[in-house]
Amino acid sequence: MFPSSAENSGKCCSQPLFGSFASSESFETSGSDRYGAYESIGLGTLITEDSDSVFDNSNGGYSDTCSSTWAADMLGLDRPFAMSSQRSRSPFSDSGRESQHSTSNLSDSSSLHSPSHSRPAPIGSRGRDMHPYGQRNYRGRGAVVHEAKGQSVGCSCENPSIWIERYCSASPTLVFRGTKRKMMEPVPPCTLVKKKRIVRAAPSKSNIVGPHILEDSCLSSDAKEINGEHELGKKVRAREKRRRRREKNHEKYGDKHRLAFTCAFCKFHTFEDKDIEKHFGSTYHRETLDYIRRQAKFDDKVISFLHDCMVNKFHKTVSNLHKLKFSCGRSKDEWAKIMEGVTEDDYMRRMEVVYCVACDVHIPVLFSSVQQHLHSLTHLKSKVAYKEQLKRDSVVTAKAIINNDNVKERYEKYMKGEDPFATDAKDTSSDSQDANRSDEAEEDEEENSDS
């Protein structure tokens, strides 16, 4: 029933035998009489014979005892549980097992036909149902036997059980400790394999519940609220700028600063109509218009239209002054209100002053004081810097005026040869209000450019 050692040595092993482990073989042989595989389980022979027949038919040449032993271990159903109570207690079982696997005596029933589960698990074993040291072709647990080139030791290089699991079975292959998982099925070499694309199912609308249903509407409403707050804040800032500008003009020119004669390009301000007429014919005013034409790249018709706008504004202001019978001087009641609470002990006197816009300084109406400030180094430097600043501001003001909607309509009439300022009294009053508003907007833009 059992093959002899001579037959096994002729089939499986062709290398010289290791005879230095005779003592350990004797101990293992004595223990195999009590713990043999065929004595403990009756199905051992049947399984071994079936496995031998499978290997003979499928991979002809794997009918040796070593192959049948490993197949019996792999195809055994409940043998680990049946043999768990019959494990060897011999302290020399491991050493004897090593010697048997290293020698050619493969006929010993205790080492070849008994499964690895019936032996004490050595260090490095993964426990029950897992065979240790798979990387050594299942030849033992001792030192690795170095093979010479062209020679084979023991069984074939590939174990039949692995061949069965890889080619004849649909179950996944064994994974040992330290090996990497195979994420894709093995493919033949020189074959382009496209990586499988992971498609994630998008959540359906029916599954969306709660506040997410109106997500788009909420976002749109939030955007509208943000835009509304932005527009409101913009209007508030513009209103504050106009208020500060009015206060500044009130400090400079008094309560009637809106009824003064002004030139928006040259920033000329006066309460005398003769002074403003003189300014419109001055060289300084013409130089300012030429500077605007060069910097803004306007045509001559645009420059002449802007000049006519300033002249028309002057005529409107004159007509309004005649209607209101306005005088630039202050009345006695106004002076009394201003000087209220002032006594002789305070040593305060009312007098006229000269205001220097370039230096932002008030000078007493005295010849010596005015001449001293006129020839001072501070005034000379401030005068040059202020003139350059006025030129830059004039370009910004001209662009703001020409881009106004009302001014655009007038400019179209002006280009057609019509009189753009020939309107009735109602339109004139509304235009004057619009002009004042546009002037305030222009002043706001000038403040932004200064900052």
UniProtKB/Swiss-Prot annotation:
Region (Disordered), start-end ranges: 83-137, 229-251, 413-451
Biased composition (Acidic residues): 440-451
Comp. bias intervals (Basic residues): 235-247
Primary location: nucleus
GO biological process: mRNA processing; regulation of DNA-templated transcription elongation; regulation of RNA splicing; RNA splicing
Zinc finger intervals, C2H2 AKAP95-type: 263-285, 356-379
Assigned GO CC terms: DBIRD complex; nucleus
Assembly: Component of the DBIRD complex.
PANTHER family in UniProt: A-KINASE ANCHOR PROTEIN AKAP 8, DBIRD COMPLEX SUBUNIT ZNF326
UniProt short sequence motif Bipartite nuclear localization signal, positions renumbered to this chain: 180-200
Entry coiled-coil feature ranges: none
Family: Belongs to the AKAP95 family.
Pfam families (UniProt xref): AKAP95
InterPro entries, alphabetized: AKAP95 (IPR007071), ZF_C2H2_AKAP95 (IPR034736)
Gene that specifies this protein: znf326
GO MF term list: DNA binding; RNA polymerase II complex binding; zinc ion binding
Entry protein name: DBIRD complex subunit ZNF326
PROSITE patterns: ZF_C2H2_AKAP95 (PS51799)
Subcellular location: Nucleus
Keyword Nucleotide-binding on entry: no
Biased composition (Basic and acidic residues): 413-439
Low complexity: compositionally biased ranges: 84-94, 101-118
Function: Core component of the DBIRD complex, a multiprotein complex that acts at the interface between core mRNP particles and RNA polymerase II (RNAPII) and integrates transcript elongation with the regulation of alternative splicing.
Keywords, ordered alphabetically: DNA-binding, Metal-binding, mRNA processing, mRNA splicing, Nucleus, Repeat, Zinc, Zinc-finger
